[in-house]
Amino acid sequence: MTDTFFKASRMGKVVYPVTEMLDEAYLLEPPEFEGHWDPHVWNDINAWSKAAEAVLLAFCEQDPDHCDRYKENAKAYQKRLELLDKYVHKTMASIPKEKRILITAHDAFNYFGRAYDVEGVGIQGLTTESEAGIEDIN
């Protein structure tokens, strides 16, 4: 993903890698990708709300004439995210903790697991470039 950002930047595109705009204490760094943040922050609604603030700042920087409108939209969006977060917490609480296991092909739900107390198992790992074997599923 970093390469994509660099290429776009070299082509004159404005690039704002959202995870780099968030507080590092909030981000997850997978051991197999030391030095790189897990980019799947949208799977934690609170993290995505923080990302919306980062996007708001980027929009206001690029288009200051419409900053007030961006702020209104961000505030409304964050309110919807807050309601969604409450719903997910309530729904997840209805599942016994020992049964909260999310098995996926691609290990993209670490933020979701942390936010909602769910064990995530990605049989392919964090990247879609690896292959899952039968031993990973058993």
Model-derived regions: residue spans:
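Extracytoplasmic metal-acquisition and chelation regions
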Residues: 1-138
